[in-house]
């Protein structure tokens, strides 16, 4: 029996584990990906006290800090469900079950799919969701980034180190990047923005090579590319808790209060899976610490 089981090993989960360890709680972290989505980030430049650090390096530091405490255990396991058992919780993974007095859900988010013809067919064969992971395959190639968020802008900027030409295709008037990233995009001689345009299909033979657009660009509704990176946001991984009765908002995010508490006693949540206003690693880390302390207070009340 663990005092706290933490589902997820990103900044929220690892920060929760670190603080739970400081509080001498018997802690289990269950994660399918140590470090979470920050491991796909090239440079993190908004972590206080560190001007710039690679996502993988920060993830490693967070993990090592958590494991400094002997009460913390990290297991590589995919969680498939969480259920109540009397006053405790049972966490089911693909390889076994674990029981804990409290749970911190920090499972983060999954990539959002476009849901258009060809996307699934060419996944991994010209269709990608992580520039840092797969961009090096496109040295001196022409690629497209679909999306208009700050994340899409950063994906395009990462890809400039390999690709010779990058199209950012966005369905609205102007991409919504942070000013510092928008400035870099607009100054790049490799990046071209196609606004007010949707991609309706991805075509190819053995590999994706053509995007079908809903309006003409340079006289054609077909855009030839060597690959495409889709960055249209992420969806929370809350399917895990459908049996617990945790309240979600209209976006499927876990509703928490300032203490990272949910409506279910003993069940806490932190990070991008919650309804927090600002989805950033540093915010997730803060929520993780809050959730761990709230779990401690809950356990003290007995």
Task: Give the positions of each predicted feature.
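FAD-site-proximal beta/loop scaffold in flavoenzymes
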Residues: 110, 115, 121-137, 232-280, ...
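A Rossmann-like FAD-binding core segment of flavoenzymes
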Residues: 66-92, 97-100, 161-258, 297-301
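Beta1-alpha1 glycine-rich phosphate/pyrophosphate-binding loop at the start
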Residues: 2-69, 151-178
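Nucleotide donor/acceptor-binding cores
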Residues: 2, 25-26, 101-102, 125, ...
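Glycine/small-residue-rich loop that forms an oxyanion/phosphate-binding "nest" at active or ligand-binding sites
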Residues: 75-137
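Residue-level detector of alpha-helix initiation sites
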Residues: 10-11, 109-111, 150-151, 275
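Phosphate-coordination loops involved in phosphoryl transfer and adenosine-cofactor binding
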Residues: 1-3, 76, 139-141, 196, ...
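Rossmann-like nucleotide/phosphate-binding core characteristic of flavoprotein oxidoreductases
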Residues: 1-7, 22-25, 210, 214-215, ...
């Amino acid at each position: 029996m663990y005092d706290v089981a933490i589902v997820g090993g990103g900044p929220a989960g690892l920060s929760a584990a670190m603080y739970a360890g400081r509080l001498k709680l018997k802690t289990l972290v269950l994660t399918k990906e140590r470090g979470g989505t920050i491991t796909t980030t090239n440079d993190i430049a908004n972590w206080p006290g560190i001007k710039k650090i690679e996502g993988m390096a920060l993830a490693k530091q967070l993990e090592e800090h958590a494991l400094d405490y002997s009460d913390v255990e990290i297991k590589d396991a995919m969680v498939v469900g969480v259920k109540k058992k009397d006053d405790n919780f049972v966490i089911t993974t693909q390889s076994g079950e674990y029981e804990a007095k409290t749970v911190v859900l920090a499972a983060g988010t999954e990539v959002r799919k476009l849901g258009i013809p060809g996307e699934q067919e060419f996944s991994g064969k010209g269709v990608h969701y992580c520039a840092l992971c797969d961009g090096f395959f496109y040295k001196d190639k022409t690629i497209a980034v679909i999306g208009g968020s700050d994340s899409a802008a950063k994906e395009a900027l990462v890809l400039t180190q390999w690709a010779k030409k990058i199209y950012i295709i966005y369905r609205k008037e102007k991409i919504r990047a942070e000013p510092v990233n928008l400035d870099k995009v607009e100054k790049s001689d490799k990046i071209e923005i196609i606004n007010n345009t949707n991609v309706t299909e991805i075509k190819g033979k053995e590999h994706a090579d053509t995007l079908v657009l809903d309006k003409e660009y340079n006289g054609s509704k077909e855009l030839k590319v060597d690959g495409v990176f889709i960055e249209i946001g992420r969806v929370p991984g809350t399917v895990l808790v459908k049996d617990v009765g945790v309240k979600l908002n209209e976006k499927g995010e876990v509703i928490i209060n300032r203490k990272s508490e949910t409506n279910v006693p003993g069940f806490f949540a932190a990070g991008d899976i919650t309804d927090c206003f600002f989805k950033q690693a540093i915010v997730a880390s803060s929520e993780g610490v809050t959730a761990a302390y709230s779990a401690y207070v809950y356990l003290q009340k007995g």
